[in-house]
């Protein structure tokens, strides 16, 4: 099931200013190899959110080739700390190259391994935590992330409508993870959540 009409997606992408060479190269690389990335429409939205809350400490749970990392790091600006995480050393190596070429290596910490384990090993609170790991892990990510977001900060999550599978039985483990995550964010007294039907569904949750 398509969450949005493909022609609408095309229309929105056509409206966007051209990305720089690095981001356009990453988009082509991801498309050729079927690597999921947030894409330019959500990338710009993520950039805007980072600027709106003046985020300086951001933890990404799952970063793949670093496409979202670059959008975040550019928005956060100098002096920020953005944590990149991925369990695939090859993806992390490629991401590092892209991040260096994008001019934001000074503010990105590259961590390789299980994202939730790495998160548990990283002290401190965060302005934004962005969840884009395996969907079975979303409920655990919720439980670990919410206590460590500062008041007024954001919990963000991609793929929360999961290609429409949230309304279609039978439901596999990934879909059940998304369903539970969505239930948790809307029942939490600590968050004010909104799910936007953009691309594959994007959750924006303000920490109260």
Where are these regions (language model features)?
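A short alpha-helical cap/connector motif
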Residues: 1-128, 135-156, 160-208
């Amino acid at each position: 099931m398509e969450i949005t009409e493909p022609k609408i997606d095309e229309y929105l992408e056509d409206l966007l200013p051209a990305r720089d060479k690095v981001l356009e190269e990453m988009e082509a690389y991801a498309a050729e190899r079927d690597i999921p990335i947030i894409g330019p429409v959500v990338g710009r939205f993520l950039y805007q959110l980072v600027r709106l809350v003046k985020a300086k400490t951001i933890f990404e749970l799952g970063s793949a080739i670093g496409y979202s990392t670059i959008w975040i790091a550019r928005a956060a600006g100098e002096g920020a700390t953005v944590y990149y995480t991925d369990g695939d050393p090859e993806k992390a190596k490629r991401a590092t190259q892209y991040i260096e070429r994008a001019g934001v290596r000074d503010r990105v910490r590259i961590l390789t391994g299980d994202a939730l384990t790495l998160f548990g090993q990283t002290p401190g609170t965060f302005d934004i935590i962005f969840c884009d790991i395996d969907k079975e892990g979303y409920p655990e990510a919720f439980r670990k992330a919410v206590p460590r977001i500062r008041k007024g900060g954001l919990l963000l999550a991609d793929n929360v409508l999961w290609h429409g599978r949230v309304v279609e039985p039978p439901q596999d483990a990934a879909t059940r993870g998304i369903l539970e995550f969505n239930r948790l964010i809307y029942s939490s007294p600590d968050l004010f959540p909104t799910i936007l039907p953009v691309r594959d569904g994007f959750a924006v949750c303000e920490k109260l």
